[in-house]
């Protein structure tokens, strides 16, 4: 009896430094976010630079500092819990998890839209067939779920292949852009990099950019599966961050130089841009191989976020703030299979809703993306607030960074994160009805937050009798 009470499920340590670097690249750098941002013009380059300096860099500092102070499985959930208490930890983890219920379906949509180009330009119209798109999305969702249940020892290879696909796809895009620039020039002028007279549509991009730069914390969510995390994590964060940031700016500039901003499609924008550029330089044959590489990249993104975020309900299940069976691990593969299955089922429902209950595909995509931005950034309010709390604490306890560094990173990160959340409520130009957009944004966000409150307070009441039972069992064992 006592052995069952004290025994906690464990996950295998299978991730090395370069596994983490590739994980960071495939999780942070998402080529398909670039078109929705670049469609707003050259001014977004300045938003990228501001976000890299005031959000991404502080994020790296926060991940390394907090991972050293609080090593272990759980990431943003564990950090908020240790610094601010149980409820804030649960809310942070809940938002991190539920955001992926909205984000993973958009990844499925990316995959379908891009993969049909691998069959040739004549099959591109298949992406507009709702039945085909839904079936293919659900097949990918099932495959990713199975791979992550089998374990990161297997699933990490999809992440790694996805990272390689990302590098190849980004390299092809940038090289084509450079070729177009030197052979045909560009219509981009200095005025395109100025703030427009009506910046409303550009404002939404700032939240999406911050969302696109999230991902460095993902490895810490898998903290118990990293080999020698104290030595492995800092170098992996540095390399992964530099590579992802450079790829984002390079890809955005390439799109702006090679394609008019009013011709950039939010969905399929990258592969359409490559098709346009490849035809211009006489290498149209690369479209299908490029689509394959980009499809691998998208599959890697889905695998990385599905596997990483599923660790949140796994840990929350262990702490009894959600149904205890979410803390179960697979008897053979030692993975949080229950949490992965629940996440897959919810994502399945959202995929079906996306294809059958939405208006225009681009508008539905933009709504889901904006909702994901809000929920994803909530945990980072806690992350950066934690740095400020450490920075002002007396006496100061130094772990990796100085007081001044923690205060700068905490302040910069907290301000940019708050702005990113607020600006996500500004509608993008794809939105046709502003009031419907605002109602859905506020309503769905509140619904997710109220569900978090429900789960926490209902299961925390159930937790008290469990704790009492454990104490009685320990007393019986001692006597």
PLM regions and their residue ranges:
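Membrane-interface "cap" regions at the ends of multi-pass membrane proteins
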Residues: 1-50, 56-61, 70-73, 190, ...
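C-terminal membrane-solvent junction of multi-pass transporters and transport-like membrane proteins
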Residues: 10, 158, 326-334, 377-430, ...
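Helix-loop-helix junctions that connect adjacent transmembrane segments
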Residues: 11, 45-46, 122-132, 160-291
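Membrane-helix boundary/coupling elements in multi-pass transport proteins
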Residues: 95-110, 213, 218-225, 248, ...
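Membrane-interface loop-to-helix entry segments
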Residues: 132-183, 237-242, 373-382, 402-413, ...
């Amino acid at each position: 009896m006592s052995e069952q009470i004290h025994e906690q499920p464990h996950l295998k340590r299978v991730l090395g430094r370069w596994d983490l670097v590739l994980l960071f690249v495939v999780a942070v750098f998402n080529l398909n976010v670039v078109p929705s941002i670049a469609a707003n013009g050259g001014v977004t380059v300045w938003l990228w630079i501001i976000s890299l300096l005031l959000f991404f860099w502080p994020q790296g500092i926060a991940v390394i500092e907090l991972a050293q102070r609080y090593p272990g499985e759980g990431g943003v959930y564990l950090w908020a819990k240790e610094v601010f208490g149980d409820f804030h930890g649960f809310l942070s983890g809940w938002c991190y998890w539920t955001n992926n219920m909205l984000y993973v379906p958009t990844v499925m949509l990316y995959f379908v839209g891009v993969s049909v180009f691998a069959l040739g330009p004549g099959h591109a119209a298949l992406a507009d067939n709702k039945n085909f798109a839904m079936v293919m999305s659900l097949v990918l969702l099932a495959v990713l779920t199975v791979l992550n249940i089998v374990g990161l020892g297997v699933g990490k290879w999809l992440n790694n292949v996805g990272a390689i696909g990302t590098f190849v796809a980004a390299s092809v895009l940038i090289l084509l852009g450079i070729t177009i620039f030197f052979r045909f020039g560009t219509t981009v002028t200095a005025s395109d990099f100025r703030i427009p007279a009506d910046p409303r549509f550009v404002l939404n991009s700032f939240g999406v950019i911050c969302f696109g730069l999230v991902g460095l914390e993902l490895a810490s969510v898998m903290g118990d599966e990293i080999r020698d995390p104290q030595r492995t994590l800092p170098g992996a964060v540095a390399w992964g961050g530099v590579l992802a940031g450079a790829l984002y700016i390079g890809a955005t500039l390439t799109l702006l130089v090679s394609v008019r901003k009013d011709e950039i499609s939010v969905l399929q924008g990258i592969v359409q841009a490559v098709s346009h550029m490849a035809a211009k330089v006489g290498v149209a044959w690369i479209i299908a191989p490029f689509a394959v590489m980009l499809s691998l990249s998208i599959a890697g993104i889905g695998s990385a976020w599905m596997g990483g975020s599923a660790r949140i309900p796994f840990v929350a299940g262990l702490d009894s703030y959600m149904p205890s069976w979410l803390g179960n691990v697979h008897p053979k593969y030692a993975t949080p299979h229950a949490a992965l299955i629940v996440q897959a089922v919810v994502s399945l429902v959202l995929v079906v809703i996306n294809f059958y209950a939405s208006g225009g595909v681009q508008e539905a995509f933009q709504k889901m993306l904006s909702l994901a931005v809000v929920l994803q950034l909530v945990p980072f309010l806690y992350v950066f607030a934690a740095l400020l709390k450490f920075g002002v604490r007396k006496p100061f306890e130094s772990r990796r960074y100085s007081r001044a560094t923690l205060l700068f990173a905490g302040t910069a990160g907290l301000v940019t994160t708050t702005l990113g959340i607020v600006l996500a409520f500004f509608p993008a130009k794809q939105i046709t009805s502003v009031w419907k957009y605002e109602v859905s944004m506020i309503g769905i966000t509140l619904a997710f937050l109220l569900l978090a409150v429900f789960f926490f307070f209902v299961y925390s009441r159930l937790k008290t009798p469990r704790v009492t039972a454990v104490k009685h069992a320990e007393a019986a064992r001692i006597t």
